Curated annotation (Swiss-Prot):
Residues 1207-1220 have a biased composition (Basic and acidic residues). This is DNA-directed RNA polymerase subunit beta'. Binds 1 Mg(2+) ion per subunit. Zn(2+) binds at C61, C63, C76, C79.
């Protein structure tokens, strides 16, 4: 029966009772046969039996008496097969009735052993019983033995002989089943609760664990004896297919072999029991049956795995679920889809921001059904068949139709690896020749694509809703800002940058300098007549500009000094945007007065006195885009980008810039600088030989000398570059390369790192223009190799980090507008010593204020409570000298399974307030994970400085923080607030002890002797502050201080890593991740509630569990916050589907089944797995309950049932603007 997934609220998993398994089944599989080798038809009662599993051919019974759909539902009287669709072979199950009960390996072998906990027996003893090595007492009767006591065969016989009837012992799964059935769960639970009040140490831990499992059985209606199976389900045959290969051989799923072994052994056991065979033989057969079932469920979990041909272990049912190739990750979370294709990409400079070039053959294939429909509608083909034939023959009509079919039908382009959401964007297809897809040059940065052979995948959204979402939400022209920091991600690069740089360069003394034009058109005529050059500095009458250009009245009466190139550059900007004359932020308000002269003033004198204005570099072009986006939003910005791209390509071509050997200048001072360095090194070596300095000091000084020499050469080199040198222009404009590349070309390569990461003190004095000696070349190879292998490792590590981050935060969605939280977070600039890591401006921009902020001088209110801090407000706050602002934060959000709009603030990708339904958790994970590949892999070594520990940085440091591991070189933290009274050094055992006297108690800490202190004697220290240098362990910090302090510390530490590498990631993304690590608490004392001590639970669940106790005036439970690493936090989620698809699949499912867990389907992953629309964005329930409302005779706009309907964006006609 088909289930409509969109109708159900939650999904439960539980243990299956034997009757349940029989009720699923359509018949018992009695024989190990699969198919007949001659007829290739399924054997009767075998693993592929058509009577049990349904017909192999659609609507046809096995013997062929009934064929066609009109007999649907009839069971054939000859062969007993029901006439129905062959699809039922994917859903109908069978079963095997076992001759002896068998334990389920998941519940016996998992850690902790669930059976062992219920029975209070060790897994070792269980194994002996199950595999027939020992007997266990079931009923002692009068015998002098305990229940559940183990005994050998000899002891058993002895007791049986003596005590006969009352005494009962057994072995194998039967004995276990009887013991489990005899457990009185309620009594056992009461006893354990009593025991918990006295027990301590290991005993207590064991009792808590047992109570946990027993309570789980009590609450879930599962019976412990169901962990032992009498019946085994047989999964549908089409899920374990058998296919014929060429040459008559068969390939079969491993499961068929495993089922065959079970059936063979089961049938043999039945026969032996019928024959009344000797006990030892029956026992052996039962053990073999147990092992066969173990192998079927989880091959290799116990003992050696059962191997198939070629000694390859067979894949059991558990393996079908596990890992990247398992059911969860391969088929449920990521499926292959139709209407998709992939091809090599090539640059398409002729495209608009919202277009991509689609090769004709791909277009025909992807839009085939659409073309067929259109051909038949237009009567160009009589029916679908002839339309198909026309397409195959590439008829002329097809091309005419194709143009119209793809018009306004957006497609999605994706490039792997998809590190952030901009890895999939929508475009309107434009037909191109050839076989390569054409990509707009400006979106390459978001995709991290280049055109050296990269391939991309294309997908066609089919339904109207999908097309609407692609157009309104995913069109590439709308993705101007990066979600990680709100800065433009589509900025011109390479050719486009150098073209605009060349265009806006000024040069003194160019032809036509000092001419004054009455309008831009006049300047254009002069340029076309070669009277002036782009670089010529000229004057222009300000009054000739349109009235909407922001000039003051005074400026309009004067003449503005600019360059011809800048006049042309400004034409691409919106008409009311300020004239950009210099690369400065102030120019965004209007042009500075210093660029104007009165009519009649001598322009040549002015030009002689003023210096050249810098050309526009890459960073400034980015600033222009950001400013235009802020003022005019998406449409205007994407049009500007296209104009800037075309202008850049045009002018870089015109400039004729090339790079040649002659542009790499030789530095005349180089030999003298090297000579000087050599003599300094000689002096240092002499000092070492005389024993005046140690070897490590000598090494340090030598490396310092060479580093300094390289720096001098670098400075001299920059001085010697002409501004017109193409290599200098390329670097200065930000088009390609940086200064160190050019120092290696023309200066010296400098010191290289050896294989161990230590710097080799012999420098490479040559540069690439002179060429390296063999020795220098060899020294250089170490670094190059390390670089290559580091990059490969980094990519894998970074990808895995992103996966864990996504998993822990995937259910964080903006769920409401406000949650009335009364707590905020006070933020200041993040400092590292004296340097600013992240300024206050960055931290408060786009957030909501928790408290009103007043100007300390004038007492004027700058921003009110719950008001957004935008750029202007943030500037005011910083300029007023305010150092700390309390903002609404994700840390203090009280929204369950997500955050509220006010806690999160601005959506960085749009620059607007975030909308309800935004999947901020996934965006946060991608924003932290995506730059992961740019972080370094190495730990920095402080070059032999005494007491300087190696500091972990880059990717390893981020992992250390988010996995809540004990950091390397951990600092001790003070557990009290007080004064440091004594610091006592103890050279004998190389330690020093620090005594801190607090108000109530005194603490002493022992530290290594070499450690660097952060405080001296007599200094005040606060609780939770580090005594010595080094990273703090966040778990210790949480124990000593509160959640918020710990969260803020972790945020600061992660920001330090990213900002030091020049990567900007917004605080709010990191806040989302850290909050997920701290959303659990551990129950310390259950009070008078039903909670169990030691239980790990969500804060919201804990509050709910405490409510009844508080209302009735009973003692509530107490708990303390727990910091979980992201892997652990992802596995501890309330959704078993999400956890099982992440890691440790069998463990998660075992636990969920025993507890009878219910998955509330609140996150994204669990909904993707069951194929339900995800509850984020347009899939949110609120946005899906839209009804038409009738007003009079006309149907008005659809209206949502919920309060938050106002947050639904109006579908403004984004697309139309691009067609203009």
């Amino acid at each position: 029966m088909a289930i409509d997934v969109n109708k159900f609220e939650s999904m439960q998993i539980a243990l299956a009772s034997p009757d349940k398994i029989r009720s699923w089944s359509y018949g018992e599989v009695k024989k190990p046969e699969t198919i007949n080798y001659r007829t290739l038809k399924p054997e009767k009662d075998g693993l592929f039996d058509e009577r049990i599993f349904g017909p192999t051919k659609d609507y046809e019974c096995a013997c062929g008496k009934y064929k066609r759909i009109r007999y649907k539902g009839i069971v054939c009287d000859r062969c007993g097969v029901e006439v129905t669709s062959s699809k039922v072979r994917r859903e109908r199950m069978g079963h095997i009735e076992l001759a002896a009960p068998v334990t389920h390996i998941w519940y016996f072998k998992g850690i902790p052993s669930r059976m062992g906990l219920v029975l209070d027996m060790s897994p070792r003893s269980l194994e002996e019983i199950i595999y027939f090595a020992s007997y266990v007492v079931i009923e002692p009767g009068d015998a002098p033995v305990e229940k559940k006591q183990m005994m050998t065969e000899r002891e058993y016989r002895q007791l049986k002989k003596e005590y006969g009837a009352g005494f009962k012992a057994g072995m194998g799964a039967e004995a276990i089943k009887e013991l489990l059935a005899n457990v009185d769960l309620a009594t056992e639970a009461d006893e354990l609760k009593r025991e918990l009040q006295e027990a301590t140490g290991q005993k207590r831990v064991r009792a808590v664990r047992r109570l946990d499992i027993i309570e789980a059985f009590l609450q879930s209606d599962n019976k412990p004896e169901w962990m032992v199976m009498e019946v085994i389900p047989v999964i549908p045959p089409d899920l374990r297919p058998m296919v014929q290969l060429e040459g008559g051989r068969f390939a079969t799923s491993d499961l068929n072999d495993l089922y065959r072994r079970v059936i063979n052994r089961n049938n043999r056991l039945k026969r032996l029991l019928d024959l009344n065979a000797p006990g030892i033989i029956v026992q052996n057969e039962k053990r073999m049956l147990q092992e066969a079932v173990d192998a079927l469920i989880d091959n290799g979990r116990r003992g050696r795995p059962v191997a198939g041909p070629g000694n390859r272990p067979l894949k059991s049912l558990s393996h079908m679920l596990k890992g990247k190739q398992g059911r969860f990750r391969q088929n449920l979370l990521g499926k292959r889809v139709d209407y998709s294709g992939r091809s090599v990409i090539d640059v398409g400079p002729f495209l608009k921001m919202n277009q991509m070039g689609l090769p004709v053959p791909m277009a025909i294939e992807l839009f085939r059904p659409f073309i067929m429909k259109e051909l038949t509608t237009r009567k160009l083909a009589g029916n679908v068949k002839s339309a198909k034939r026309k397409i195959d023959k590439a008829d002329g009509d097809v091309m005419d139709v194709l143009e119209d079919v793809i018009k306004e039908h957006p497609v999605l382009l994706n490039r792997a690896p998809t590190l952030h959401r901009l890895g999939i964007q929508a475009f309107e297809p434009v037909l191109v020749s050839g076989k390569a897809m054409r990509l707009h040059p400006l979106v390459t940065e978001a995709y991290n694509a280049d055109f050296d052979g990269d391939q991309m995948a294309i997908h066609v959204p089919l339904s109207d809703e999908a097309q609407a979402e692609a157009r309104l939400l995913m069109l590439a022209a709308g993705h101007i800002l990066a979600p990680k920091d709100g800065k433009p991600i589509v900025a011109p690069s390479q050719d486009m940058v150098i073209g605009n740089y060349y265009l806006t360069t000024e040069e003194a003394g160019r032809e036509g300098e000092g001419m004054i034009f009455s309008s831009v058109d006049e300047a254009r005529i002069a340029f076309a007549s070669k009277v002036v050059h782009y670089h010529t500095r000229v004057g222009i009458q300000t009054s000739s500009f349109p009235s909407e250009k922001p000039f003051t009245d005074e400026q309009r009466s004067k003449i503005m000094i600019t360059s011809v190139g800048k006049l042309f550059f400004n034409e691409i900007l919106p008409s009311d945007f300020p004239y950009i004359n210099e690369p400065s932020e102030d120019n965004f308000k209007r042009v500075d007065d210093s660029f104007f002269i009165d009519a009649g003033e001598n322009i040549h004198d002015y030009l002689a006195d003023t210096s050249i204005v810098n050309p526009f570099k890459k960073g400034f072009l980015s600033d222009i885009i950001a400013e235009v986006y802020k003022r005019y939003k998406v449409t205007e910005t994407s049009l500007l980008l296209d104009r800037m791209k075309d202008l850049g390509y045009d002018k870089s071509t015109e400039s004729g810039l090339t790079v040649s050997m002659t542009d790499v200048l030789e530095l005349e001072e180089k030999p003298a600088i090297l000579e000087d360095a050599h003599s300094q090194v000689a002096t240092v070596t002499k000092q070492f030989r005389r024993g005046l300095i140690t070897d490590s000091e000598r090494y340090q000084r030598v490396t310092e000398i060479w580093t300094k020499a390289k720096d001098i050469i670098q400075d001299k080199l920059i001085e010697s570059f002409e501004p017109t040198n193409p290599i200098f222009m390329m670097q200065d404009s930000g088009a390609r390369g940086n200064i160190s590349n050019f120092v290696q070309l023309a200066g010296m390569r400098g010191l290289m790192a050896g294989p161990g990461g230590k710097i080799i003190e012999l420098p490479v004095t040559a540069n690439f223009r002179e060429g390296l000696t063999v020795m220098e070349m060899f020294i250089s190879t170490h670094g190059a190799r390390k670089g290559m292998s580091d990059t490969a490792l980094k990519t894998a590590n970074s990808g895995y980090l992103t996966r864990r981050l996504v998993d822990v935060a995937q259910d964080v969605i903006v769920r409401e507008f406000d949650n009335d939280s009364d707590r905020g977070v006070a933020v200041q600039a993040i400092m590292d010593g004296t340097s600013v890591v992240e300024p206050l401006y960055d931290r408060i921009l786009g957030r909501y204020a928790m408290k009103s902020v007043f100007d300390p001088e004038t007492d004027e209110k700058i921003v009110s409570r719950n008001e957004m801090i935008d750029e202007d407000v943030a500037k005011k706050i910083v300029n007023a000298g305010i150092k700390e602002v309390t903002i609404r934060s994700v840390f203090t959000s009280t929204t369950e399974h997500g955050v509220s709009v006010l806690d999160y603030g601005r959506n960085l990708a749009s620059g607007e307030e975030v909308e309800v339904g935004e999947a901020v958790g996934t965006v946060a994970a991608q924003s932290i994970g995506e730059p992961g590949t740019q972080l370094t892999m190495r730990n920095f070594h402080t070059g032999g400085v005494a007491g300087g520990n190696d500091i972990t940085q880059g990717l390893p440091r981020v992992q250390e923080i988010v996995e809540a591991r004990i950091p390397k070189g951990r600092a001790e933290i003070s557990e009290v607030t007080g004064t440091i009274t004594v610091i006592e050094e103890n050279p004998a055992d190389r330690t020093k002890s620090v005594t801190i006297e607090g108000e109530t108690d005194t603490r002493t800490y022992t530290l290594p002797l070499t450690t660097r202190m952060r405080f001296g004697e007599g200094d005040e220290i606060k609780r939770g502050e580090a005594i010595n240098e080094g990273p703090i362990d966040p778990k210790e910090l949480l124990a000593v201080t509160d959640t918020l302090t710990t969260e803020s510390y972790m945020l600061t530490e992660i920001q330090k890593v990213y900002r030091l590498q020049g990567i900007e990631v917004s605080d709010k993304h990191i806040e989302v991740m850290i909050r997920q690590m701290l959303r659990k608490i551990r129950v310390m004392d259950p009070g008078q509630t039903d909670l169990l001590p030691g239980t790990l639970m969500d804060i919201a669940d804990f509050k709910r569990a405490n409510e009844p106790a508080l209302f009735e005036g009973l003692v509530p439970a107490t708990a303390r916050p727990v910091l979980l690493g992201i892997t652990k936090a992802a596995l501890e989620t309330n959704s078993f589907l999400s956890a099982a698809s992440f890691q440790e699949t069998t463990r998660v499912l075992t636990d969920a089944a025993i507890r009878g867990k219910n998955d509330p389907l609140v996150g994204l992953k669990e909904n993707v797995i069951i194929g339900k629309i995800i509850p984020a964005g347009t899939g949110m329930a609120e946005y899906r309950k839209i009804k038409s409302k009738v007003v009079g005779d006309v149907i008005a706009q659809p209206e949502s049932e919920s309060e938050e309907a106002s947050d639904i964006p109006k579908l403004d006609d984004v697309a139309k603007t691009f067609d203009n």
